[in-house]
Amino acid sequence: MSILIYKVSKSLGNLKILDRVSLYVPKFSLIALLGPSGSGKSSLLRIIAGLDNCDYGNIWLHGIDVTNISTQYRRMSFVFQHYALFKHMTVYENISFGLRLRGFSAQKITNKVNDLLNCLRIADISFEYPAQLSGGQKQRVALARSLAIQPDFLLLDEPFGALDGELRRHLSKWLKRYLQDNKITTIMVTHDQKEAISMADEIVILKEGRLLQQGKPKNLYDQPINFFVGIFLGLLIEIPKLNESITLKNIPSKTPQNLKKFAFDPIWVKIFANRSINKYRFFLRPYEFCIKSEMDLEATPVQIKTIIYKRTFVQLDLFVTSFLWNLTIPIGYQSFRNLHIESFMQTLYIKPRLQVFLRAYPILTNIKKN
């Protein structure tokens, strides 16, 4: 049950909500839509659901053009941020509503609803009404109702936005398994990049109504098409750069010694020998650095400035004396313990794990974040 979106455009007066967006969602896959507020994510979901019309373009569901077909004939469920629960029905009645309309037997309805109540951890509120529920509970009820009818297609707008911590992590893992087991093609909007990377088969990045990049999470994380996509998906660490308009093949004598050392280092400049350093910014992800506490002649010594303990990682603020370079690197707690840091006076050693740059962006065209 695939979804094809072809050159979909939508405007509100002079404001372009969506600008010729095209993407393909393979059957039974989960696609995550990411982008800043106002990028058109929710608007695109509403057009796919048939709740809004597009000014131009087409929506194809499993090979059928449904652009002008009513929502009720699209075999689709959706969960939007307003939940839209029936106020006069209990939680149990809300979830079973679609099943009763479709004429399922009482036993099948009971089994299906009870299973979803337990999996989503809302069995204890099954006879309460929406007005008695918290935002997180309403969100789970809406999700259970959308899953109960076993749709071919599922559209989710921030399905776990009102949840925190362990419950959110548990339900995201459960939902991914459920969608795979029941072969439901899904498009999910989320502002949680980590959630998108862990759940989605592919990620789509939108900005100002335009699709910037689509691909597998690892590909987008490792090889973002531009600086905006790179920094949006996670921390980018910019390496030191020369201030002269030169190439790596022609380092002038007036270049500061520390930067000359950096520029000549074959580890750092492996594949950009023919590019003008002054016109590009070079970046690495935190995991592409190797940090050691033992002396390593192939690594660069660094000073420890601060250590900040976070919930799932430790943030190291370091200073590379030889390059006059401040950098921040998050590492896991086990990796931090392996460093055996006993004092801020202790010297660490750092080097890139890779001998190529995966990310180099022209300064003038990609320096802006918004």
From Swiss-Prot:
It is an enzyme of class 7 (translocase). SMART domains: AAA. PROSITE patterns: ABC_TRANSPORTER_1, ABC_TRANSPORTER_2, CYSA. GO terms for molecular function: ABC-type sulfate transporter activity; ABC-type thiosulfate transporter activity; ATP binding; ATP hydrolysis activity. The keyword NAD does not apply. Gene3D superfamilies: P-loop containing nucleotide triphosphate hydrolases. Residues 3-233 form the ABC transporter domain. ATP binds at residues 35-42. PANTHER family: SPERMIDINE/PUTRESCINE IMPORT ATP-BINDING PROTEIN POTA (PTHR42781), SPERMIDINE_PUTRESCINE IMPORT ATP-BINDING PROTEIN POTA (PTHR42781:SF4). This is Sulfate/thiosulfate import ATP-binding protein CysA. It comes from Marchantia polymorpha.
